[in-house]
Amino acid sequence: MGNCIRTEMWKAFHNKMMRSALLIGFILVIADLVQTAITVSDLGASYAHSPGGYDGCSLFVNWIGVNGVTVGAVVFYAVWPFLAAMPYGWSLYEDNRSHMTNNILTRVPYSQYLTAKMAAVFVSGGIAIALPVTTDLFASAMVCPACIPRVALPITGFCSGTAFLAKLYYTHPWLHAIIWCVIEFFWGGVAASLCIIVGHKVKHRFFVTATPLLLFLLLDFITPMLADAMNWYIELSPLRLCNLASTNPSPTWIILAELILLTFVSVLAGIYRKYRHEVL
């Protein structure tokens, strides 16, 4: 099992699609940083002499995980499921297409192969999302003052009392931001793992890679209607829950619940594939 996991991890992190995903992510981070630096520079003097002080220039309302307005942030959070799947989400399909699976299964059981594959897909997807976001956090700290935003300002509306770890945001914002970077890792991993569901069925590599984005776009269309029908004023779309600056409140429990649910779906798909292989 250990050798199988190491092999899959090596393949996941040593391919051009991983490099391409990170390149796109870092280009969007640079775009976010440039726009943020210009905005903070233009507003710095006026905020310094206003009753609101430096709240609008604070790191904790301007880094990519929370600002929701820069071109880099908007594009990143519009395509993040695709970026997560780019590094290795397509690998199960590619192994089947090239008949590499048959070669591998002469040396290891299918259960070990599939477990290693899912682990590599999860980790590579998580890194593809979390690494650019974390880099943006620390790079933004070089241009934005790390002052603690005050409660009930329009610029902190995304972090109301019901939002993700809201109390921590207003007391220990650095810890809140770092925890969110970890959550981003899990979002990326969960999204990439959804490719396992269609890896044996879809006959085109692009559509396998696009599966998480297409699924999340569908859920983004359906979940607002569900929320309205249930009179829930919370964000249900996983596409938007990956961004702290979502339109509706995103409580901690709904974020964790959706991560667990999507992980369960991916694991269930893996168990089904193992069962089908044993039957056949």
Please identify what each model-predicted range represents.
Residues 197, 201, 258-280:
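Junction motif at the cytosolic side of a transmembrane helix
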Residues 21, 192-205:
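Juxtamembrane helix-break-helix junctions at the cytosolic face
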Residues 28-90, 119-196, 237-259:
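Secretory targeting signals
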Residues 1-25:
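Aromatic- and glycine-rich beta-strand/loop motifs that create alpha-glucan
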Residues 21-28, 205-219:
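Central hydrophobic cores of alpha-helical transmembrane segments
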Residues 17-18, 109-111, 115, 204-209:
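Membrane-helix interface segments
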Residues 90-124:
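Helix-loop-helix units of permease transmembrane domains in multi-pass membrane transporters
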